[in-house]
Amino acid sequence: MIAASMDRKTIADYVYRDSGIEATGLIPKNMPLFSAPDSLMSFNMALASNYLERSKIGQKKEKIDISYVSTSEEYRLTSFLLMDNLRKIGVGLDIKPGTWSMNWDRARKIETSPNIISMAWWPTLASPSDWFFGLYQTEENPLFNLSYYSNSSVDSILDLAWRNESLYPEVSRGLYKDIQDSLIKDCVVIPVVDINVQSVHQSNITGLKKNPAYSTLLIYHLGKMR
C-alpha cells in the first residue's frame, strides 16, 4: 500500500531535480554489481487502495507515522507528498520531523520507533554489501537496521554474496538482486531516489576529488592556484 503510494518520479523530478535521480533498486544504479530487482513497485494509487482493503489498517482505520530529518527540505516535501497520496485512499499519516540524533534514538527503541523513517545511507565501502549488512542484517540490538528486519535466509545469501565479490562477481550480482527482491516482497524498504552529492568550491582550488565511498568525508590535499 505505502510503496504503491510513493511517487518516485515526481519526487526525483520536482523535489530533488538535479540533486537526485529516480531509484531503480535498493542501492544506487552506479554501484558495482548492481542489478535492478524485478519486483520494484510502481506508483499506482488504484493498487494502493486495493492493498489497503486487504490490510489491517484498512479494517481499523489506524494512522501511521513518518519521521524525517527536519533540516532537509527534500525529506519534508517527500513526506508531505506521501501524506497527500495516502489521504486520497483514507489513510492518515502523522509527520514527525526532528534532528537525526533524535530520530535515530527514537527509532532504536521499539516503543518509540515510527512506522516509517526517511533516511539516506552513506556507505563506507563501494559495495552493495555495505547497504545490506548495515541496514537489513539481523541485529539483536539494532544500530541502523531500524526496520527490525530479521530473515535468516537473507542473512545467509548476503554472506555468500559478500564472499564471492572478488572471485565470482557475477554470482554476487545475482545474489544481491535476489536480496533486493526479498526485501521488496517483505515490504521492508521503499527506495525513492539515488542522491547526487554536490561539492561547491572556488574555481582556483585544486585537489578536490569525488569520494566514491563515504562521500561526506572531506579529506583532501587541497591547493590554491595563484
Annotated model-derived regions:
Residues 1-13, 150-166, 170-173:
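Extended ligand-binding regions for polar small-molecule ligands
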Residues 1-89, 150, 178:
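Append "and occasionally in soluble cytosolic enzymes with long acidic Gly/Pro-rich linkers
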Residues 88-137, 175:
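Periplasmic binding protein-like
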Residues 5, 135, 182:
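Conserved catalytic core of Hanks-type protein kinase domains
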Residues 22, 34, 72-75, 102-104, ...:
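Flexible loop/turn segments at secondary-structure boundaries
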Residues 32-47, 57-60, 108-112, 133-163, ...:
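Short, solvent-exposed loop/beta-turn-alpha elements that line the ligand-binding surface or hinge
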Residues 54-70, 114-120, 166-203:
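Bilobed periplasmic-binding protein-like "clamshell/Venus-flytrap" ligand-binding domains
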Residues 2, 66, 86, 107, ...:
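Hydrophobic, well-ordered secondary-structure elements that form the walls
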